[in-house]
Amino acid sequence: MYKSIYSLAQASFTEQKSEFIAKISPVKTEEDAVSFIESVKAENRKARHNCYAYVLSGGNLSRYSDDGEPSGTAGSPILDVIQKNGLSDVAIVVTRYFGGILLGKGGLTRAYSTAASMAVSAARIMELEPAKALTVT
């Protein structure tokens, strides 16, 4: 048994003049995840950073990116939120519009984690049971 989400959800907040916009989407394949990430980046071309994480295959495949933020301050906290909520087959992208104030490593980690958590809270979560397709002849 694992958890995923029904559909796209979004949440946002402002931290010291930087706007953080988090979007979470269900994805079935790595190609779906990359397509979702690229679409969010295209929507937010003027953003300073579009950091992401995704988990597929019941947690067997995960990827993340800090997209130019200091190492370990963005993608990893987003991935932690996905894993702590027991989610799979989801991708989260957190877009940051820089407000001119540096947040520091701790501030960035908290901000990206908060944004990702808010997106998960905004999503409708469902429980799924892995199944195999059988053909009867």
Regions inferred by a protein language model and the residue ranges of each:
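Stable alpha-helical structural segments in soluble proteins, enriched in small hydrophobic residues
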Residues: 111, 115-123
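Short glycine-/aliphatic-rich beta-strand segments at the starts of folded cytosolic domains
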Residues: 126-137
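C-terminal regulatory domains involved in ligand/effector binding and gene-expression control
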Residues: 1-73
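Ordered, amphipathic secondary-structure segments that act as subunit-interaction surfaces
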Residues: 69-105
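Conserved structured catalytic cores and adjacent interaction surfaces
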Residues: 107-109
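Structural motif
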Residues: 23, 51-52, 89-92, 135
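Short flexible coil/turn linkers enriched for glycine and charged/polar residues
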Residues: 18, 47, 86-88, 128-130
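Short, flexible, solvent-exposed loop/turn segments with mixed acidic/basic and small polar residues
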Residues: 11-15, 122-127
